[in-house]
């Protein structure tokens, strides 16, 4: 009985059939039949259960397949509205809400039913769906691990191929003479039908331990040559060397795939880190797929600049503080029915603090601050600009209330209808989208827009109208009080000499730097620190600041530039002519220092202290022209010739003459009219006046310059001795200050102001007015309260 069961066991899946054969009459003895019947019933029951289980699996798979909607008809079964599975138990319909996530996970994982996303919209988490939407489903960490493991794999492959024992190559003749004829060959292995590896008889391996191999042209030729050779050597029967054919991987397949892998890796890296996606984290994968996304940065508590670090533009600062106060305390304005202005545009010359004021706004506002440059909207692809504008304002609405700052908005906000030559301009499309987003049907709420530009004259009028930019804030160069306040800000971190007081030093430096912008003031303070460090000084003294001012005004001092004695003498008399002419002209600027040491592009240098004023008379402009012509006149008087050194002087005189006649209406023949002079770099296609008027203007300019030149000749001819004394002392000392001029020429015959107190006399106070209106005195109070509140109360509010 046992051996029969064992035979049946060996038949595998034929147990039932074998038992049936044994149960027929005569198959087994009568005593064995009851046991076999019991075994038969057990086996058939198990087989039937196995068949039922297989049938159940097939039916379940079929139901899962049929539960999915046909391809292309997914939209007709949104969100599982095609009903539940028929095979789903009723208890699932009555499950509590807490068990729904698990049921959803099971249905989506198994692909059944219409309750999951498979019955409707495609799962957004699927990697291919994310890839099509421009979002690679691997973050930077996964990418780094992927490249690391790939590099390790290919490095291991290369290491294996380099260190793999390559054996020793021999020729057919060496194989015959040294191995086959001596009977040390056990067998020959034909590898990949390319070469033959020789396997030696045990105990007869070469001393170096390397196997030997030789190349073959073709397998048929090798077999014929081997058979012929063995016959010649008398090797017959079982003594003949067996030939084995094997296939091995020598790494050539992997090496052939390496270029493909490198190309794929490069494409993935390019897609993820394309030109439009560099530095963009968390918003798509960058590159070509996200070229329409905005490149704006959202700043939250990342700026260290505060309003206390901004000086010299108090009026503009108050305007911006009001925006911040509205976002922090809107009830103060809403109770009166006021609406927050949509935006403000900051205009003014370069370096006056427009971007710095925006940074201070970002540092003080307790709301998100979004910054973007106007040039970032325009790319080489058509339609990118409007798409980025839409994405930018969508980002702003998402973070509302917030402040949006567009720097250099003139790059995208230029007037429409210029320079397109009949073609559609991408810049115009971007501007149109910007206008719609700022004040159209899709207006923003609680989003304040700030913008900065140096050229408000070229902006489109539709961009500047109320409702888009309600306020235009002009930030001009600071006056003497503003410069003193700016100096106080930039003197804080500097290590000054113990004899210097910051307030007095700031006022003195402000009086020495008329016309300086905030950026120039910051540059002066930094240059003074660099000069002190260059001389290994322990602190910064007043002399360092004076040298820094000269460095900013005149440029780098070139002590190593060698001038010929004749050239040096010409430069000395040229600068002496400027100094003496200005000394004896009432409306000329007071002289501070004159030098014949080359600075910047010039061979000489004169520093004046111009009076800060906003209105100029005709006599004042004429005196300035005469002082500027003093160098050329001095050359002609003392040398009887003129040089090219007066080129810059003549340019300034010509500009002043044209401005008086064309812009200011200071000529009787041309009349009381004003035309705009073209800016440097502007394209002038036609003049706004006739040819006859242009000829008249040119004639009057020439007459005005000639009159100024004759007046200067008469003045310096009268003061010829003074010019010579100043020139000789310049040749001796190279640098003269105001005290030297007083010693040579006596006190200046006209009253002049030189100290800070004299300049601010009659203006009300010595310092800039930094007081706040009543409504803005507690503008930062809400933020301080939030800081004092414990975390639990803050969350509760």
Swiss-Prot record:
Residues found modified as N6-succinyllysine: 117
Keywords: ATP-binding, Disease variant, Hydrolase, Membrane, Metal-binding, Metalloprotease, Mitochondrion, Mitochondrion inner membrane, Neurodegeneration, Nucleotide-binding, Protease, Spinocerebellar ataxia, Transit peptide, Transmembrane, Transmembrane helix, Zinc
Segments for region (Disordered): 76-126, 759-797
GO biological process: axonogenesis; calcium import into the mitochondrion; cellular response to glutathione; cristae formation; membrane protein proteolysis; mitochondrial calcium ion homeostasis; mitochondrial fusion; mitochondrial protein processing
Top-tier EC class: hydrolase
Binding site for ATP: 310-311, 352-356, 490
Gly residues: compositionally biased ranges: 108-117
Required cofactor names: Zn(2+)
Gene3D superfamilies: 1.10.8.60, 3.40.1690.20, P-loop containing nucleotide triphosphate hydrolases, Peptidase M41
Result of changing residue 289 to A: Reduced rate of protein degradation
Biased segments, Basic and acidic residues type: 85-100, 775-797
Tissue: Ubiquitous. Highly expressed in the cerebellar Purkinje cells.
Residues binding Zn(2+): 574, 578, 649
Residues that span the membrane, as ranges: 143-163, 251-271
Compartment annotation: Mitochondrion inner membrane
Alphabetized PROSITE patterns for the sequence: AAA
Effect of residue 462 to V: In OPA12 and SPAX5; decreased proteolytic function
Cofactor binding description: Binds 1 zinc ion per subunit.
UniProt-reported outcome of changing residue 430 to I: In OPA12; uncertain significance
Catalytic center residues: 575
Outcome, altering residue 380 to V: Increased ATP hydrolysis
Record keyword Mitochondrion present: yes
Effect of residue 621 to V: In SCA28; uncertain significance
GO CC annotation: m-AAA complex; mitochondrial inner membrane; mitochondrion
Name recorded for this polypeptide: Mitochondrial inner membrane m-AAA protease component AFG3L2
Organism: Homo sapiens (Human)
Taxonomic lineage: Eukaryota, Metazoa, Chordata, Craniata, Vertebrata
Gene: AFG3L2
């Amino acid at each position: 009985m046992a051996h029969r069961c064992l035979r049946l066991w060996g038949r595998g899946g034929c147990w039932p059939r074998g038992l049936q054969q044994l149960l027929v009459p005569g198959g087994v003895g009568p005593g064995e039949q009851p046991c076999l019947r019991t075994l038969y019933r057990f086996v058939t029951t198990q087989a039937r259960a196995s068949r039922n289980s297989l049938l159940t699996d097939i039916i379940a798979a079929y139901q899962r397949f049929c539960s999915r909607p046909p391809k292309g008809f997914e939209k007709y079964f949104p969100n599982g509205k095609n009903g539940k599975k028929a095979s789903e138990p009723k208890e699932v319909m009555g499950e509590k809400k807490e068990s729904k996530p698990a049921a959803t996970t099971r249905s989506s994982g198994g692909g059944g039913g219409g309750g999951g996303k498979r019955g409707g919209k495609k799962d957004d988490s699927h990697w291919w769906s994310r890839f099509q939407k421009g979002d690679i489903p691997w973050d930077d960490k996964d990418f780094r691990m992927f490249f690391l493991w790939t590099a390790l794999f290919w490095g291991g492959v290369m290491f294996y191929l380099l260190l793999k024992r390559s054996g020793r190559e021999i020729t057919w003749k060496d194989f015959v003479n040294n191995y086959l004829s001596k009977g040390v060959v056990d067998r020959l292995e034909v590898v990949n039908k390319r070469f033959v590896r020789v396997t030696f008889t045990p105990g007869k391996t070469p001393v170096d331990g390397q196997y030997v191999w030789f190349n073959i042209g073709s397998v048929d030729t090798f077999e014929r040559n081997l058979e012929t050779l063995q016959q010649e050597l008398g090797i017959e029967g079982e003594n003949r060397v067996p030939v084995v054919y094997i296939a091995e991987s020598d790494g050539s397949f992997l090496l052939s795939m390496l270029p493909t892998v490198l190309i794929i890796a490069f494409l993935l890296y390019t897609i993820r880190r394309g030109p439009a996606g560099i530095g963009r984290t968390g918003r798509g994968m960058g590159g070509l797929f996200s070229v329409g996304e905005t490149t704006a940065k959202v700043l939250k508590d990342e700026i260290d600049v505060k309003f206390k670090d901004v000086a010299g533009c108090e009026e503009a600062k108050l305007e911006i503080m009001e925006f911040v106060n509205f976002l922090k305390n809107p009830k103060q304005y809403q109770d009166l029915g006021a609406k927050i202005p949509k935006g403000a545009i900051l205009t003014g010359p370069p370096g006056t603090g427009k971007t710095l004021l925006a940074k201070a706004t970002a540092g003080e506002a307790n709301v998100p601050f979004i910054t973007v440059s106007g040039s970032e909207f325009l790319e080489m692809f058509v339609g990118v600009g409007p798409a980025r504008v839409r994405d930018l304002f969508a980002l702003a609405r998402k973070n509302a209330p917030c402040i949006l700052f567009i720097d250099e908005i003139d790059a995208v906000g230029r007037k429409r209808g210029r320079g397109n030559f009949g073609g559609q301009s991408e810049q115009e499309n971007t501007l149109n989208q910007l206008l719609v987003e700022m004040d159209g049907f899709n207006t923003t709420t609680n989003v304040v827009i700030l913008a900065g530009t140096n050229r408000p004259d070229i902006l489109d009028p539709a961009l500047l109208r109320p409702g888009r930019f309600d306020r235009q804030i002009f930030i001009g160069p600071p006056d003497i009080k503003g410069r003193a306040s700016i100096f106080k800000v930039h003197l804080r971190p500097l290590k000054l000499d113990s004899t210097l007081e910051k307030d007095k030093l700031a006022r003195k430096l402000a009086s020495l730097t008329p016309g300086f912008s905030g950026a120039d003031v910051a540059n002066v303070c930094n240059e003074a620190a660099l000069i002190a460090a260059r001389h290994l000084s322990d602190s910064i003294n007043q002399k360092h600041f004076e040298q820094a001012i000269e460095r900013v005004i005149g440029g780098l001092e070139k002590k190593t530039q060698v001038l010929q004695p004749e050239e040096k003498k010409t430069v000395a008399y040229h600068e002496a002519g400027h100094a003496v002419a200005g000394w004896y002209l009432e409306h000329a600027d007071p002289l501070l220092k004159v030098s014949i040491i080359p600075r910047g592009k010039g061979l000489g240098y004169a520093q004046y202290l111009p009076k800060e004023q906003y209105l100029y008379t005709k006599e004042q402009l004429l005196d300035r022209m005469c002082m500027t012509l003093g160098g050329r006149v001095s050359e002609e008087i003392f040398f009887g010739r003129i040089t090219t050194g007066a080129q810059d002087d003549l340019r300034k005189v010509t500009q002043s003459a044209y401005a008086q006649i064309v812009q200011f209406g200071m000529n009787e023949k041309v009349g009381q009219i004003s035309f705009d002079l073209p800016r440097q770099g502007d394209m002038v296609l036609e003049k706004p006046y006739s040819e006859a008027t242009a000829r008249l203007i040119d004639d009057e300019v020439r007459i005005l310059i000639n009159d100024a030149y004759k007046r200067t000749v008469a003045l310096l001819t009268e003061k010829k001795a003074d010019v010579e004394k100043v020139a000789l002392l310049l040749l001796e000392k190279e640098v003269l200050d105001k005290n030297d001029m007083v010693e040579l020429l006596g006190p200046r015959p006209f009253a002049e102001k030189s100290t800070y107190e004299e300049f601010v006399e009659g203006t009300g106070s010595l310092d800039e007015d930094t007081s706040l209106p009543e409504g803005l005195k507690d503008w930062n109070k809400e933020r301080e309260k939030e800081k004092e509140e414990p975390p639990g109360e803050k969350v509760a509010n």
